[in-house]
């Protein structure tokens, strides 16, 4: 062991006696402060302050560079050493005085900032501070102004209002606005009445639409035979089918309205069917059959009747469907077999 470090002898210590510095040990910093500091809000909007010692060193270095240039020039000219020293001292004093003057003057130009490089951090920070100072003087902003202080005042005002409200001090709070309008405090009732009026208006509108549709439906001439149309015809379904569909759509809204005109028509049409049956010619019989076919088809497509309908209407519809359910194909086949039997 050397320099009285460690044990007096390595004997019995289990070590070789070699002493070295602990490389993992870090000395605590002087004037150590935790981050972020307590006054972080005040420091947040301040620009980075340059190191004044480094800036002073750079300025003195520029002065010494100019002094050495003068010395080299005088030595080349062959001037004596004493004369060179005196001239260099005069130039140094002159440049230092000029530097002090520029440093003390606040509105002085910052120098060739455009020649500063990115690694000259302290020089750039100093130039930025001087530029901000000139801008503050031009806009007449006070020195103690802090950026964002206006928002801070608003936050403090809002916080005070919330604290007063929590403490129950409602005397300083403005009174709530009085309800406007003739109804006064009965606004809820007015809104309810308005909602009811809206519902009634919609219902009246639907009923008016139904009535207008019934009015627009053209009256059908039951004495005239319907035009025959096949299944693959151009028109698809006939006008009677469209009318039935429209009544069926209207029945979803108001079933009692949509079914009443159909019943009245079926009752008024009964004498026409009786007269058609009493006629003897074949043409009239086929006409009545085609009529019955279209009517039975429309009846099958009509909307379902109510359960509480009259028994007379039910029996009437059943008898009609039984009497007119014969198709023209069956009649044709029967006539053909009849002719064949007559021939035999």
Swiss-Prot record:
This is Pre-mRNA-splicing factor cwc-21. Residues 1-58, 98-344 are annotated as: Disordered. It is found in: Cytoplasm; Nucleus. Keywords: Coiled coil, Cytoplasm, mRNA processing, mRNA splicing, Nucleus, Spliceosome. Residues 69-105 form a coiled coil. Associates with the NTC complex (or PRP19-associated complex). The NTC complex associates with the spliceosome after the release of the U1 and U4 snRNAs and forms the CWC spliceosome subcomplex reminiscent of a late-stage spliceosome. Residues 38-58, 120-167, 188-226, 238-277, 307-316, 327-344 have a biased composition (Basic and acidic residues). Gene3D superfamilies: 6.10.140.420. InterPro entries: CWC21, mRNA_splic_Cwf21_dom. One of its GO terms (cellular component) is nucleus. Residues 1-19 have a biased composition (Polar residues). CDD domains: cwf21_CWC21-like. GO terms for biological process: mRNA processing; RNA splicing. Residues 288-306 have a biased composition (Basic residues). Transmembrane segments: none annotated. The gene is cwc-21. Belongs to the CWC21 family. The keyword Nucleus applies. Its main location: cytoplasm. Residues 55-98 form the CWF21 domain. Involved in pre-mRNA splicing. May function at or prior to the first catalytic step of splicing at the catalytic center of the spliceosome. May do so by stabilizing the catalytic center or the position of the RNA substrate. Disulfide bonds: none annotated.
């Amino acid at each position: 062991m050397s320099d009285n470090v460690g044990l007096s002898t390595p004997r019995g210590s289990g070590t070789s006696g070699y002493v070295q510095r602990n490389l993992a040990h870090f000395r605590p910093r002087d004037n150590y402060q935790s981050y972020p500091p307590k006054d972080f809000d005040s420091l947040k909007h301040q620009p980075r302050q340059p190191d004044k010692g480094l800036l002073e060193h750079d300025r003195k270095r520029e002065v010494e560079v100019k002094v050495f240039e003068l010395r080299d020039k005088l030595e080349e000219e062959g001037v004596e050493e004493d004369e060179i020293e005196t001239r260099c001292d005069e130039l140094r004093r002159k440049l230092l005085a000029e530097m002090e003057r520029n440093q003390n003057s606040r509105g002085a130009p910052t120098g060739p900032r455009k020649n500063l490089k990115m690694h000259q951090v302290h020089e750039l920070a100093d130039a930025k501070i001087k530029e901000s100072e000139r801008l503050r003087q031009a806009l007449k902003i006070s020195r103690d102004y802090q950026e964002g202080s206006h928002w801070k005042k608003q936050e403090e005002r809002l916080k005070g209002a919330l604290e007063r409200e929590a403490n129950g001090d409602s005397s300083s709070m403005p009174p709530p606005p009085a309800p406007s309008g003739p109804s006064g405090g009965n606004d809820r009732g007015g809104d309810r009445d308005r909602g009811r009026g809206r519902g009634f208006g919609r219902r009246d509108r639907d009923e008016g639409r139904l009535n207008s549709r019934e009015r627009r439906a053209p009256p059908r001439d039951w004495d005239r035979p319907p035009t025959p149309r096949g299944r693959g015809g151009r028109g698809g379904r006939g006008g009677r089918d469209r009318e039935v569909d429209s009544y069926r759509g209207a029945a979803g809204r108001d079933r009692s309205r949509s079914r009443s005109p159909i019943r009245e028509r079926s009752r008024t049409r009964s004498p026409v069917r009786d007269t058609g049956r009493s006629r003897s010619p074949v043409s009239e019989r086929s006409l009545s059959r085609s009529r019955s076919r279209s009517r039975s088809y429309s009846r099958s497509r009509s909307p379902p009747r109510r359960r509480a309908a009259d028994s007379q209407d039910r029996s009437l519809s059943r008898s009609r469907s039984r009497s007119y359910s014969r198709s023209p194909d069956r009649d044709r086949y029967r006539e053909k077999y009849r002719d064949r039997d007559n021939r035999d």
